[in-house]
């Protein structure tokens, strides 16, 4: 298939600039795999579509406030780093601005001067390896103090509260972007879901900025996916196996949870406790081996994420649903409304 097959026209005013308030007041488009029907609901209505014995799998990764502004030493020139991933120990891969002026050996101080770093190496893609002279725990404390959330480029409004870009169950620091399908959940909604006999299990996948990288190739199978680190605990793996064995549904909350489960199922033939890196690319024609349903947001045209949704729900039906979403003025992208496929 071609990249252009996944294009749709989206009015700019439908790109959400802030989350729904309260979170579960977002709209929910419900797509039935049984009869192809489309229903228009509110996210807090989600429990009506869940059955006792179902298992929701959420991504508990937490976004690092990883965008930090500093000054070069000794010139005092302003610069910016965005921490992308931990390479080893105190060394991180970073996006640097202005990159050309931050050559190896450049020293930078941040905040009140207690956070310092030095550029070690420039990579082929222009990113930098940077060493921070702190252990990981101390660095995270400094980022909490000085850092800003690395919001997607299509969100131009500043957050009133940085917690707006975290899920209520986020706990494992490491993402450069939020697993946004989970932003719609509130503690009260999760309690309601559990009270219905529906389980909630956690996996971890640290979302990289590659999630925003556009597909450049015309033929989608020529696209090379970015790699992201994931982890599945023994408890979660066992709950998923038991759910499947009992004939109940495993519903992924977000494309990151989906990619984690499908990567492990494809690699091992079952869900097992493990961790590693995945660059799995799910597009029409690729078979799913674990999930039975998906909760997700409305994604960018020609993105790998709309391709993933098309792989699960079907290309024609997915593009038709997006057309309806535009007509019905759903809110799109990270802070937008949600879709449930069951």
Residue ranges and their predicted role:
Residues 1-342:
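Surface-exposed, charge/polar-rich loops and edge strands
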């Amino acid at each position: 298939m071609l990249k252009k097959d996944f294009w749709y026209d989206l009015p700019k005013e439908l790109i959400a600039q802030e989350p729904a308030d309260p979170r579960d007041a977002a709209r929910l488009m419900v797509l039935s795999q049984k009869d192809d029907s489309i229903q228009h609901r509110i996210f807090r209505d989600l429990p009506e579509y869940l059955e006792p014995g179902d298992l929701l799998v959420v991504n508990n990764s937490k976004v690092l406030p990883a965008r930090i502004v500093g000054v070069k030493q000794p010139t005092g020139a302003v610069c910016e780093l965005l921490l992308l991933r931990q390479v080893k120990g105190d060394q991180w891969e970073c996006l640097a601005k202005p990159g050309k002026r931050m050559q190896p050996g450049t020293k930078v101080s941040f905040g009140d001067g207690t956070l310092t770093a030095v550029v070690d190496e420039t990579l082929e893609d222009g990113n930098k390896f940077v060493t921070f002279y702190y252990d990981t725990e101390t660095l995270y404390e400094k980022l909490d103090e000085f850092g800003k959330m690395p919001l997607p480029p299509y969100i131009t409004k500043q957050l009133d509260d940085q917690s707006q870009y975290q899920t209520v169950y986020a706990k494992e620091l490491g993402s450069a972007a939020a697993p946004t399908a989970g932003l719609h959940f509130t503690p009260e909604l999760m309690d309601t879901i559990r009270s219905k006999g529906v389980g909630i299990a956690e996996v971890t996948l640290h979302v990289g900025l590659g999630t925003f990288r556009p597909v450049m190739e015309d033929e989608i199978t020529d696209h090379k996916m970015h790699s992201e680190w994931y982890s599945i605990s023994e408890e979660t793996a066992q709950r998923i196996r038991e759910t499947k064995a009992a004939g109940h549904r495993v519903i992924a909350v977000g494309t990151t949870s989906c990619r984690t489960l499908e990567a492990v199922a494809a690699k091992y033939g079952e869900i097992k406790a493990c961790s590693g890196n995945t660059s799995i690319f799910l597009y029409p024609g690729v078979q799913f081996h674990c999930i039975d349903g998906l909760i997700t947001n409305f994604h960018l045209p020609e993105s790998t994420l709309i391709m993933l949704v098309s792989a699960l729900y079907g290309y024609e039906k997915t593009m038709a649903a997006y057309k309806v979403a535009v007509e019905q003025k759903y809110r799109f992208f990270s802070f937008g409304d949600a879709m449930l496929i069951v």
